[in-house]
Structure formats: structure tokens, C-alpha cells
From Swiss-Prot:
Na(+) 3 binds at F761, G770, Y773, S949. This is Ceruloplasmin. The keyword Isomerase does not apply. The gene is CP. GO terms for cellular component: extracellular space; plasma membrane. Found in a complex with MPO and LTF; interacts directly with MPO and LTF, which allows Fe(3+) incorporation into LTF, activation of CP ferroxidase activity and protection of CP antioxidant properties by MPO.
Length: 1048
């Protein structure tokens, strides 16, 4: 996964007054844990249940569903004899620790396990001697005692619920945090040592319950990787009937030990999630794990509010912390599932029960009122992913030998090519289904998608569905109120009665669905006028087959009679996804129809499977999508939505223009499985621009289109007045870059963890490259002679491989005098800025060129942003290879005069780029093999282990504590970026101020975070993705005592 992050601001907070002392007696014990629960195994009918045996059945070389684990338990007192029972739905999670702002929490930890562990808290303040995490931090003696609690030993951890760690202004009363063991955090957590910590605003609890909340639940979505557990060897010996036959490196064995679970329960076996209809329910959610842990937690039949926005799906990633509120509706048995379609098949679901307790309903009965009736059929088509046969970006034939597109469009004995039989939704005029509605020019861009279903709050949506295909199908809506008969899917446990007829409509059958839009599912006061939603057929394979369409749910009175949004010139719906044709219901038909030797096709062949993964938008690839055209100055709404699996992490970049979403100014929108966004754009420059996914594999695989902005009679000149002017002299310079100049921190870390690990990324071994690579970087010079480089100051030392940190205010014109001192063509282009042309001209080696970036209002902060927002600049000659070769830097744009008027004190600014530099994609790979490999003649560039050794998990181009210069004083105002900060929380703007200590970053993401350090020490800063931690994406930052603050 390619993860970006750029820039932070700190805010000074007041001192805390301790309110209450709270004591928790926590023991670590070892136990046998059953992922299928001790209840009868529940198999889900809507899911491909053959998968359950892969994970739950033991055998000669399979462990099965029971594993030895270490877990946290709560005891009544310091004698550690009497266990306090926890709710059954917590599974193997530790007990809930709760604190209000101002409380002082004492955690008395006793280790009953057979190896050392610790207790490390997120979201509370602690001094170094109570951190519970082991890494090289210059602590000794008493300050080290907390870092490793040996078997049989005890340790006291003292934690403070400071205001700056507590809920922000716009946060809910209680927010989700976590605690876990932190000797080797990924292995400790995989072994079971993880639990919830809930930090509440002062006076928001009543006898440990949040006021005005009837029920609360904590859920962790995780692919628990038992291959990483400290107890793997023991589990093999105990539960495999022929342990000597186990090959731990076997991929199938490893997959059988990845337990797709909610709180440690798989395949719907989590007990105890029960509530009454009309109960006010608070959900605390978090994710943990690895790159595979891309979760979309979907609450069937319900709609929630999170951060004051209306949601039904919550995206969770490793160490993502969320809370959400719902009023339970619709009595019945509903599924809480991960809508990552691979995870759904593998058992990541739970049931929750909404019981009819005869409470009076809070919702208006709008059934049958303001009916909008749609007639939709599912039918077969032959779909061509690129009708022109041409790559609109390179002008090459899509089957050109050696092109990136050839793998997907080649047709032959065992290749299907670019056309597939698919199923699609299409709209008809009436219930006879004889006259299909023609799509007008404004709908041309919809492509493979079904018709737009539009509704306002107060409406009833009636959909008469006719199945013209040969498979049972349905329509399942997202974001409206449904009952069990109209849900469009079925997943109840075996033996619970026949499925409702709307859950699967037989071939040639017809069913009329009825859904309602009460105000409780409509936009909140913070939401846009229309919420982007979707509908699809209710089986995982159906979506990949093509059955998905857009829906929008709008405020009352906001739509015209034809369903278009008032006061908007254009509306576009985009569905970026990797259509996995291997999962299509029609795969066998496509093999027979399009391959010339179908009997020779091996459906398990990796190259064959890859050729069928179509990286598309609305079913179009490589710029073949029609209809994305608008006029300069138009008011444009973009509705984006996605579905799929863990590869469907999208950073959708709109070149040439910016948009507003939830008050924030951006040009790159992040999408995940079953998420949707509404974006507002007013294009201000005529030309042809790109809309593309910045996830590297998706971009090269064809997930990119063109959109056109025409003058339409408008004046083309830029009338904005640019009063400020800045000039920067930037060169592209080739350097030798060392990702790990010192191995001292890394080796000390492994010594402290008592592990003797080799490093596939940094060790050269026989033919690997090691830690040094030839790269190209942006560097600043004093003037146009490019003779004297600008020396980096102490506060810029942290930038590492990044180019200079450039600054501009709204109203500025920025002149970039760029000299290419490298050996191949490069350029420099920034996100967010306005340029005269949509084309970025390459600069040849030895040449100098001027690039002009204008900073109009639409390049600056939105009303929901921090005053200064980060953008990124890089070379676009070959966006992928240029980036991985090293060309990237930060641009900070502030509101006009912000730094002069509002911020007279100079803040520290830290820009951090979290990126897996894939050196296999560098222009200099061959040079690096020749220069740094001990045996270049033995190198096989296609060897998987060699390729993996060149994926450098770095922060600003440094690994394992090698990033220098992150130093600040207590009370400093600082600008920072990162994923998880030990010791401190930060604030971030999201149309209001929120607090966390973990921030999620995705392709093309930049975010300003604000933090005021309070606690001196050397603290860990790292990515919380398991593989990234082990691969070295971690460093430390230093908080020095403020000499002006007197001790005590």
C-alpha cells in the first residue's frame, strides 16, 4: 500500500486538574481461544460457506479454530484472585478501561503468562516510566521497568486523562482509544493482547455509562494473523494431528491461520449484540493488523451518525479509532459485516439483534408518501472496457507489445481480452419492461452503472425489479430505511425460516421493493445537500458481474422534477473499482466465448487471473470514458462511490482543479469498499484534464480518464488579482541515498526485543542491493546560476529525501525556476495550484524551464480546514517511476496574510512522507544493481524475494529510527505529520476540531495535524500497519524540557 502524509500545527492547551483516581487490576493470562465460539457454529447463507472449512477445520497440517492466546483480564483487587466478568461480546479483547478528562488512571498489571509483555495506552498522557513500549529511547533503570514485565512480575502504569488527549470540541462525549502490549507490538497484538480504552469529556458518565446512551458496544475488525503469534509453534504441536508435516512458509497454511474476525469471532458466531428498537446505541470501533486490514464495517438495516455525518459504513484500518451513534430501528436479526468482499467470504461478519420492546417509534411513518417509482431490469450485455482500442494517454494501441495495457487487452488461446459478457441494471419506462429508457448526453458517462435513483427526505422509493438474466439476483440499497422483506439480501443462520422473496429474484421473476427516506437517514446539518449512495445485487459475485448503480439521498426540496439537483449545472457519478472478472458469475461463459483455446485455460494461473482484473471507472479504462465534459465556471457535483476488496483503496485525483468536500479543499478523494463521497467543483481553467487513481497499480492498470472544461463563451483570461510573487530555484539532482545510514537503532531495538532478525531490506546478502540506492531529488539553490545550494537549517533536517518545503499564500504567483541536473527528462508539478496549461512540459537534461503556479482562493484552505493546508509537488514525465526515483516535496498554502496577522510567532513545521519506495519501479534500478549488488550477474529482477527487498518502508526516505531533526520543546507550536505518536495526541480540523493519536493516510492524502508537546522524552513515531513496522517505517521524535518552564 502506498501511503502519503504531509504537514501539522500544534495548539497550546491548558493544564489539567485531576478529578478522580481510578484503579484497574489487569492480569495477562494464557488461554485456548475458539474463533468459532463455544456456541453452535453459525454459517451465513448469503456467503460462500465452503470457505469456513479453510479457517475452522483442523487436520494433519491445519490448526483449526482453536488457538492458544494471551489475553488481558480484569480482577477485583491487588490479590488477582477474582476475575470481573466482562460482556460476552468483547470476545478476546481486554476489559473496557474508561476515564473522564481530569481522571488519573492506575493500571496494576500482573503477568501470568509464560513470556514478557506490557501495557501501552493510546490517548492518555504518561511519562516515560509508564509508556509500556520498548525501543531505543535513551531511558535507563526505573524508566525501563515498564518496558518489559516478566512472567510472574507486576508493574504499575500511571496514566493521566489530560484535556489535550481527550475528545475535541466536535468529538462525541466519549471517543475510542486502545491499549495493547508493545514489546514487539505486531506479535503481541496477534497473540491477543489488545483492549479498548474509552476517553470521555468531563461529567459525561453516570456510573460508568455515558449519559443518554442505552447500550454501548466495542468491536474490533481484524484479520488476526496467527502466523505472527508467539504461540504459533505451540499451536501447531497441540492442534495439528501430524505437526511434523507442517510447512510454516506454505501459503495455504499461512492463509488458514488468518482469522477474519470481529472481536475474535468468525462466521457470525459473536454472541451478545442485542438491543431494543429505539435504543440509543453507541458503537466504539477500531481496526488492527496489516495491509490486508482494509475494512468497511457495514450495519445492515441501520443508519449511524459519526463526527456529525450520516454513515452506514465505517472504514477501519490498522489502529483506526472510530465512534458512531445510532437509534436502533427495524426489529429483526441484522448483519454487521465487512464489505471488503474477500473478507465477507472469509467470515468477517457478526449478527446483532434488534428486539421489539414496545418502545414508541421516533420516526415518522412515511410509507407510501411522495412515491418515486423506478422500473429496473437486470440483463446480459457484452461490455467493452475500452471501445476505442486506444490508450488516450499514450495514443498507443491497447494491445501494443510491452505496454502496461497489453496484459488486460491481449486476446488469445488463454486470454479473454477487453470484452466480457456482464450483467447490468437498466431502466425501463413501465412494468411491461418492453421500452428501455434511452440515456441522454448527461448520462453517457454512467457506462456500466445502473440508472441513478434519486430521492429526497420524506420520499418512498418503489423499485419494480425484473430479472432477465439466468441467475437469481436482487437489488440491495445502501443509505435508506428497509425492512427484512425489502433488504435485497439474505444471511440468517441455518434453520431460521425461508428467505424473503426480495432477497433473490428468480430468472424471469419480478419483485417490487419499497424503501423509505425518513429524516433520520437523510443529510445532517454538516452533510452536503445530497449524500452519494449505491445499490447492488446482494451476493459478492453479483457486483463483480456488473450489477451496481448510483443513488443519491437529498434534503427535502432540493431536487427538480427530473431528479436533478437544483442550482447545479452538471452532475457526474464515478465508480472506480477493480472489476475482478475471475469472481464474475459469467467467467466460464467468457472463457468459452472469447478465448481461442478454452480447454487450455487454467483459472488458477496467476497471470490469467491478473489479466481479468479490470482497473476501471464506470467500466472504462485508459481514458475511454465518454461524457465527462463541462463549462468553465460551471457548478459541478461529483458523486463517487466504490465497492470491492482490499485492493480497492483509491486516491481519485482531479488534475487542474480543486473541489470542496465537507468544507475541506482538496484535489484527491480517498475511496474504500462501500464508501461514497459528494464533491463540489467550479472549474476555472479551460482544457482537458485527468481524473485518475493515484494508487500506483491502479494508475498503470488503466484507472484513469479525461475530463474536458470548455470556455462556452466565457472569457479565458484569469481575472484573479495575484499581488504576491515568490520565486524558487529548484533542481533535480542525482544522489546516492542511504535509507539506513546507521544500523545502531535497529540493532538495539532487536536486542531489547530479544530477537535476532536479519533484514531483507537492508542486508545485502549475496545479490541484494542493500540500503544505498542512486536516486534523484529536488534541491533548492540560491539563484538562477544553480551554483550554490541552499543549506538546510536545523528545523529542515527532518525533510530527508523530500524536496524543499515551499510556502505560498492565497493570492500569490509562484515562479519555479527548474533546472534538470539529472540524466533523463523530469518536470515539477504541484497539486492544488492553477496553471496556464493542463500539460506539464518535461525539462530535458541540462535544460532550465520556468513553471508558474498561481494560488487563487480555490487553492487555499476551505472553511473546514486548518489555516494552512499541504499539497505535494512531483515530476509527471512518468508519474510512477519519477516518484519512486525520489522526486517529491511539500507545498504549504496558507490563507492570505495568515502567518503575518494570526501567527506572529514562528511555528515549527514538520512535513512527513510515509511511502513504500518501490525501487523496482525506479529509473535507476539497473544502475543500482550494477553499483551495489555484490553479484549483479546473478540478479533476477523478476525474483519475488529480490523485488520485495527493494520495497523500502520509509519516513522521508529513512528507516529504523534514522530520520533526524524531529526535535521540539515543551509548549512549542509545531507542524507535524504522522500516523501514531507515542506520548501525545494531536488535533485536526474536519469542520470542527477533533482529537486522536492515530491518523490514516492513503494514496494522495495530505493532512494538517496540530499538536502541542507536553511531556519531555524521546518518543516513538510509526506507521501502525504490521508489515510496515517490521520493515522499518518508524522513527523517534524528541521533546526537550522548556527552559523557561520551572520544574514542579
Amino acid at each position: 500500500m502506498k501511503i502519503f502524509l504531509l504537514c501539522i500545527f500544534l495548539i497550546l492547551c491548558g493544564t489539567s486538574v485531576w478529578a478522580k483516581d481510578k484503579h484497574y487490576y489487569i492480569g495477562i493470562i494464557e488461554t485456548a481461544w475458539n474463533y468459532a465460539s463455544d456456541h453452535a457454529e453459525k454459517k451465513l447463507i448469503s456467503v460462500d460457506t465452503e470457505h469456513s472449512n479453510i479457517y475452522l477445520q483442523n487436520g494433519p497440517n491445519r490448526i483449526g479454530s482453536v488457538y492458544k492466546k494471551a489475553v488481558y483480564l480484569q480482577y477485583t483487587d491487588e490479590n488477582f484472585r477474582t476475575v470481573i466478568e466482562k460482556p460476552v461480546w468483547l470476545g478476546f479483547l481486554g476489559p473496557i478501561i474508561k476515564a473522564e478528562t481530569g481522571d488519573k488512571v492506575y493500571v496494576h498489571l500482573k503477568n501470568f503468562a509464560s513470556r514478557p509483555y506490557t501495557f501501552h495506552a493510546h490517548g492518555l498522557t504518561y511519562y516515560k516510566e509508564h509508556e509500556g513500549a520498548i525501543y531505543p529511547d535513551n531511558t535507563t533503570d526505573l524508566q525501563k521497568a515498564d518496558d518489559k514485565v516478566q512472567p510472574g512480575e507486576q508493574c504499575l502504569y500511571i496514566l493521566h486523562a489530560n484535556p489535550e488527549q481527550g475528545p475535541g470540541e466536535e468529538d462525541s462525549n466519549c471517543v475510542t482509544r486502545i491499549y495493547h502490549s508493545h514489546i514487539d507490538a505486531p506479535k503481541d497484538i496477534a497473540s491477543g493482547l489488545i483492549g479498548p480504552l474509552i476517553h470521555c469529556k468531563k461529567d459525561s458518565l453516570d456510573e460508568e455509562k455515558e449519559k443518554n446512551i442505552d447500550k454501548e458496544f466495542v468491536v474490533m475488525f481484524s484479520v488476526v494473523d496467527e502466523n505472527l503469534s508467539w504461540y504459533l509453534e505451540e499451536n501447531i504441536k497441540t492442534y495439528c494431528s501430524e505437526p511434523e508435516k507442517v510447512e510454516q512458509d506454505n501459503e495455504d497454511f499461512q492463509e488458514s491461520n488468518r482469522m477474519y474476525s470481529v472481536n475474535g469471532y468468525a462466521f457470525g458466531s459473536l454472541p451478545g449484540l442485542s438491543m431494543c428498537a429505539e435504543d440509543r446505541v453507541k458503537w466504539y470501533l477500531f481496526g488492527m493488523g496489516n495491509e490486508i486490514d482494509v475494512h468497511a464495517a457495514f450495519f445492515h438495516g441501520q443508519v449511524l451518525t459519526s463526527k456529525n455525518y450520516r454513515v452506514d459504513t465505517i472504514n477501519l484500518f490498522p489502529a483506526t479509532l472510530f465512534d458512531a451513534f445510532m437509534v436502533a430501528q427495524n426489529p429483526g436479526q441484522w448483519m454487521l459485516s465487512c464489505q471488503n468482499l474477500n473478507h465477507l467470504k472469509a467470515g468477517l461478519q457478526a449478527f446483532f439483534w434488534v428486539q421489539d420492546c414496545k418502545k414508541s417509534s421516533s420516526e415518522d411513518n412515511i410509507h407510501g408518501k411522495n412515491v418515486r417509482h423506478y422500473y429496473i431490469a437486470a440483463e446480459e450485455v457484452i461490455w467493452n472496457y475500452a471501445p476505442s482500442g486506444i490508450d488516450a494517454f499514450t495514443k498507443e494501441n491497447l494491445r501494443a507489445p510491452g505496454s502496461a495495457s497489453e496484459a488486460f487487452f491481449e486476446q488469445g488461446p488463454t486470454r479473454i481480452g477487453g470484452s466480457y459478457k456482464k450483467l447490468v441494471y437498466r431502466e425501463y419506462t413501465d412494468a411491461s419492461f418492453s421500452n428501455q429508457k434511452e440515456r441522454g448526453p448527461e448520462e453517457e458517462h454512467l457506462g456500466i452503472l445502473g440508472p441513478v435513483i434519486a430521492a429526497e427526505v420524506g420520499d418512498t422509493i418503489r423499485v419494480t425489479f425484473h430479472n432477465k438474466a439466468a441467475h437469481p439476483l436482487s437489488i440491495e440499497p445502501i443509505g435508506v430505511r428497509v425492512d427484512k422483506n425489502n433488504e435485497g439480501t439474505y444471511y440468517s443462520p441455518t434453520g431460521s425460516g425461508p428467505p424473503p422473496s426480495g432477497s433473490h429474484v428468480a430468472p424471469k421473476g419480478t419483485f417490487t421493493y419499497e424503501w423509505t427516506v425518513p429524516k433520520e437517514v437523510g443529510p445532517t446539518y454538516k452533510d452536503p445537500v445530497c449524500l452519494a449512495k449505491m445499490y447492488y445485487s446482494g451476493s459478492t459475485k453479483d457486483i463483480f458481474t456488473g450489477l451496481i448503480g448510483p443513488m443519491k439521498i437529498c434534503r427535502n426540496g432540493s431536487l427538480l422534477a427530473n431528479g436533478r439537483l437544483k442550482n447545479v449545472d452538471k452532475e457526474f457519478y464515478l465508480f472506480p473499482t477493480v472489476f475482478d472478472e475471475n469472481e464474475s458469475l459469467l467467467l466460464d461463459d467468457n472463457i468459452k466465448m472469447f478465448t481461442t483455446a478454452p480447454d487450455q485455460v487454467d483459472k488458477e494461473n496467476e497471470d490469467f487471473q491478473e489479466s481479468n482484473k479490470m482497473h476501471s471507472m464506470n467500466g472504462f479504462m485508459y481514458g475511454n470514458q465518454p461524457g465527462l465534459s463541462m463549462c468553465q465556471g460551471d457548478s459541478v457535483m461529483w458523486y463517487l462511490f466504490s465497492a470491492g476488496n482490499e485492493v480497492d483503496i483509491h486516491g481519485i485525483y482531479f488534475s487542474g482543479n480543486t473541489y470542496l468536500s465537507r468544507g475541506e479543499r482538496r484535489d484527491t478523494a480517498n475511496l474504500f469498499p462501500q464508501t461514497s463521497l459528494s464533491l463540489f467543483m467550479q472549474p476555472d481553467t479551460a482544457g482537458t484534464f485527468d481524473v485518475e487513481c493515484l494508487t500506483t497499480d491502479h494508475y498503470t492498470g488503466g484507472m484513469k480518464q479525461k475530463y474536458t472544461v470548455s470556455q462556452c463563451g466565457q472569457r479565458s483570461e484569469d481575472l484573479y488579482l495575484y499581488l504576491g510573487e515568490r520565486t524558487y530555484y529548484i533542481a533535480a539532482v542525482e544522489v546516492e541515498w542511504d535509507y539506513s545510514p546507521s544500523r545502531k537503532w535497529e540493532k538495539e531495538l532487536h536486542h531489547l526485543q530479544e530477537q535476532n532478525l536479519s533484514n531483507a531490506f537492508l542486508d545485502k546478502e549475496e545479490f541484494y542491493i542493500g540500503s544505498k540506492y542512486k536516486k534523484v531529488v529536488y534541491r533548492q539553490f540560491t539563484d538562477s546560476t544553480f551554483q550554490v545550494p541552499v543549506e538546510r537549517k536545523g528545523e529542515e533536517e527532518h525533510l530527508g529525501i523530500l524536496g524543499p518545503q515551499l510556502h505560498a499564500d492565497v493570492g500569490d504567483k509562484v515562479n519555479i525556476i527548474f533546472k534538470n541536473m539529472a540524466t533523463r527528462p523530469y518536470s515539477i508539478h504541484a497539486h492544488g495550484v492553477k496553471t496556464e496549461s493542463s500539460t506539464v512540459t518535461p525539462t530535458a537534461p541540462g535544460e532550465t524551464r520556468t513553471y508558474i503556479w498561481k494560488i487563487p482562493e480555490r487553492s487555499g484552505a476551505g472553511m473546514g480546514d486548518s489555516p494552512c493546508i499541504p499539497w505535494v509537488y512531483y515530476s509527471t514525465v512518468d508519474r510512477v517511476k519519477d516518484l519512486f526515483s525520489g522526486l517529491i516535496g511539500p507545498l504549504i498554502v496558507c490563507r492570505k496574510h495568515y502567518l503575518k496577522v494570526s501567527n506572529p510567532i514562528k511555528k515549527l513545521e514538520f512535513s512527513l512522507l510515509f511511502l513504500v519506495f518501490d525501487e523496482n519501479e525506479s529509473w535507476y534500478l539497473d544502475d543500482n544493481i550494477k553499483t551495489y549488488s555484490d553479484h549483479p550477474e546473478k540478479v533476477d529482477k523478476a525474483n519475488e524475494e529480490f523485488m520485495e527487498s527493494n520495497k523500502m518502508h520509509a519516513i522521508n526516505g529513512r528507516m529504523f529510527g534514522n530520520l533526524q531533526g524531529l526535535t521540539m520543546h515543551v509548549g512549542n507550536e509545531v507542524d507535524l505529520h504522522s500516523v501514531h505518536f507515542h506520548g501525545h495526541s494531536f488535533q485536526y480540523q474536519h469542520r470542527g476540531i477533533y482529537t486522536s493519536d492515530v491518523f490514516d493516510l492513503f494514496p494522495g492524502t495530505y493532512q494538517t495535524l496540530e499538536m502541542t508537546p507536553k511531556t519531555p522524552g524521546i518518543w516513538l513515531l510509526h506507521c501502525h500497519v504490521t508489515d510496515h513496522i517490521h520493515a522499518g517505517m518508524e522513527t523517534t521524535y524528541t521533546v526537550l524540557p522548556n527552559e523557561e518552564i520551572k520544574s514542579g
